[in-house]
């Protein structure tokens, strides 16, 4: 059936008796392509019928469909004429794995982070009414994303729509998971709703019966509706959404296309906000994904037959090094606790949970809360470690500054996926952490160049930190580069790893491997280039920088992050203040968002790979 889907709204030509065949074709298509390219699989397998129903009811690109997070938008892309783009899904210059407005008019709003869809949708509703247009606006948010504080803020603001008689449709896609299993009060509440189907049946039966009473049926129904709060309390404790002023419908079967089409068509006719609670199965149609949806949330290329990832390295990842070190230290120190924001597996803390369930805390998709939660524990003598992707810690900036740094609490931030992350693109690149953390007083920022240094930095911080500390490390394998030259850590001190003559490269963290490649290339050409590992970004080693300024006329600073406010800018300003007469050049990322692609491809594009660094120095020497 998929051969008939080539443009937006083509699905409307499919007959209802063929919906199941189309759903099966879509799942086969997803499995065939994502197994080859990698990507977000389980969530997309689970949302096939729901997305079909939305496309049967909505008119694209006129109507506006917003996906929270956006990783579950693959089916939407298939149904809007982009199925050929799956050959290069998440590849360099290929189709994005997230909604992207410049990719299609059918992508109403870009996304990549969680809990933002309701705010964006409410803004669109407001614009619709000011502009006097009549498009339908729908937000799709998962039960995991609904645990984020921003979603509650939007729901609170959204309550005014009922008084203003304005329509907004929210689809609560309830698959009982975000990336890992959901936690917290909202998850428990939705579980109650799922299991109290008698309320939906009761409400419908009573209203229909009352309407049949001659003369007074409508009046009694009105009375019933006015007193519905007390009736609902008997069957669904709290009725959270209705209490917020938002009509609630559900739960309904998210794999029943005709039922969802009927529900959506009815919802479009309302002049008020409505939440349609849809229950789906993450990973549906592929047994390995159904059995282990967390593994198949985001997965590298894998064997369709076995479900196993095709390329596995025997070397430990930075994530594993961090996690293993944390576990070893926690065995010796009962004050060490670990915190994650709904990503125990991605951050490696799942293993910590197995060892210390009473000292492990998954707070849900709630980075702001996680930061201040850690501050509270640190204020009472505990040693909290918040392992979080660099891009997601941005969401807790004010809490770091106000709740942690002002009190100088020794909270440790394990910044996973720092630097370029690759295929997830603009919304996930961890390239802003140096500027936004380095401006905060009391904050220490560290960047290891290999696995041993990462482990030692964590141990040193756990036992000696006097205030907040961030340790930033990249996705992928832990490097073993220069591990044999490891020197004991001293606070705020860097390390010279190779002396040179013509120039020196100060290379931050994970970009050090590229600087090392450049040094080797230039050595073959007769140049002697020094290599320095700064270790500490804030405070950086001023004594070492002064020594380098007295030795070299050319200092190059390389980092896998934005140049504006980066390490290079800080060092350059310091050298300028101390009347350095030589030249300083900074390599990094200009004022831009970086698209998706492999890390090696992106480094080449940004000219921070080994060859490009060598070429920059080579040209510099000729000037």
Stretches with model-predicted labels:
Residues 64, 280-394, 399-409, 490, ...:
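Non-catalytic terminal/interface segments that mediate subunit docking, oligomerization
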Residues 40-164, 318, 336, 340-341, ...:
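Cofactor-binding active-site loop characterized by glycine-rich and histidine/acidic residues
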Residues 13, 175-322:
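Long, well-ordered, tryptophan-enriched scaffold segments
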Residues 301-305, 309-314, 422-424, 444, ...:
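Peripheral docking tails and interdomain loops at the edges
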Residues 1-78, 240-242, 246-257, 277-280:
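N-terminal amphipathic, basic-rich helices that act as targeting or association modules
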Residues 85-95, 160-175, 198-201, 405-417:
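A glycine-rich helix N-cap at a beta->alpha junction
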Residues 220-288, 410-415, 434-484, 610-623:
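Structural signature of the thiamine diphosphate
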Residues 262-265, 297-298, 307, 317-332, ...:
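Glycine-/acidic-rich phosphate or pyrophosphate-binding loops and their flanking alpha/beta elements
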């Amino acid at each position: 059936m998929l051969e008939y889907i080539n443009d937006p709204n083509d699905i409307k030509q499919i007959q209802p008796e063929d919906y199941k065949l189309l759903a099966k074709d879509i799942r086969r298509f997803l499995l065939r392509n994502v197994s080859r390219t990698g990507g977000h699989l389980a969530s997309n397998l689970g949302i096939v019928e729901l997305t079909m129903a939305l496309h049967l009811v909505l008119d694209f690109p006129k109507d506006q469909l917003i996906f929270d997070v956006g990783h579950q938008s693959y089916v939407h892309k298939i149904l809007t004429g982009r199925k050929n783009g799956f050959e290069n899904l998440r590849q360099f210059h290929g189709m994005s794995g997230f909604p992207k407005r410049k990719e299609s008019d059918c992508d109403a709003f870009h996304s990549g982070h969680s809990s933002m869809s309701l705010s964006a949708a409410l803004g669109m509703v407001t614009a619709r009414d000011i502009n006097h247009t009549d498009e339908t606006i729908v937000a799709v948010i998962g039960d995991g994303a609904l645990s984020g504080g921003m979603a509650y803020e939007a729901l609170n603001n959204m309550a005014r729509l009922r008084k203003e008689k304005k329509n907004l449709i929210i689809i609560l896609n309830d698959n009982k998971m975000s990336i890992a299993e959901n936690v917290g009060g909202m998850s428990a509440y939705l579980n109650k709703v799922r299991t109290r189907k008698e309320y939906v049946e009761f409400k419908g039966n009573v209203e229909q019966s009352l309407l049949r009473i001659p003369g007074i049926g409508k009046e009694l129904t009105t009375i019933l509706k006015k007193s519905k709060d007390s009736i609902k309390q008997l069957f669904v404790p709290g009725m959270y959404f209705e209490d917020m002023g938002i009509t609630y419908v559900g739960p309904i079967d998210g794999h029943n296309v005709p039922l969802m089409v009927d529900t959506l068509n009815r919802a479009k006719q309302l002049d008020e906000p409505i939440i349609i609670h849809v229950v789906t199965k993450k990973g549906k149609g592929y047994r390995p994904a159904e059995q282990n949806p967390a593994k198949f949330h985001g997965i590298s290329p894998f064997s369709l037959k076995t479900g196993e990832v095709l390329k596995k390295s025997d070397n430990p990842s930075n994530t594993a090094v961090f996690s293993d070190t944390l576990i070893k230290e926690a065995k010796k120190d009962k004050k060490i606790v670990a915190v994650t924001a709904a990503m125990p597996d991605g951050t490696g803390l799942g293993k910590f949970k197995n060892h210390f369930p009473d000292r492990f805390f998954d707070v849900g998709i709630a980075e702001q809360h996680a930061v201040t939660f850690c501050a509270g524990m640190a204020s009472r003598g505990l040693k909290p470690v918040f392992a979080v992707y660099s891009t997601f810690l941005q969401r807790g900036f004010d809490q770091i500054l106000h709740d942690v740094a002002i009190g100088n609490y020794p909270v440790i931030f394990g910044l996973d996926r720092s630097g370029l992350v690759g295929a997830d693109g603009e919304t996930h690149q961890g390239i802003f952490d140096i500027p936004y953390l380095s401006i905060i007083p009391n904050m220490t920022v560290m960047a290891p160049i290999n696995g041993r240094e990462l482990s030692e930095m964590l141990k040193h911080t756990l036992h000696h930190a006097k205030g907040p500390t961030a340790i930033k490390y990249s996705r992928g394998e832990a490097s073993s580069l220069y591990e044999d030259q490891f020197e004991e850590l001293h606070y705020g001190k860097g390390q010279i790893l190779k002396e040179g003559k013509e120039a020196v490269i100060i290379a931050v963290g994970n970009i050090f491997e590229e600087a090392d490649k450049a040094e080797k290339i230039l050595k073959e050409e007769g140049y002697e280039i020094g290599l320095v590992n700064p270790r500490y970004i804030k405070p950086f080693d001023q004594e070492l920088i002064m020594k380098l300024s007295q030795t070299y006329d050319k200092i190059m600073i390389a980092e896998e992050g934005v140049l504006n406010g980066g390490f290079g800018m800080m060092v350059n300003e310091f050298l300028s203040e101390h009347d350095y007469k030589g030249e300083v050049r900074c390599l990094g990322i200009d004022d831009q968002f970086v698209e998706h692609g492999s890390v090696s491809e992106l480094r080449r594009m940004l000219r921070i790979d080994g060859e490009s660094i060598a070429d920059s120095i080579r040209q510099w020497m000729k000037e």
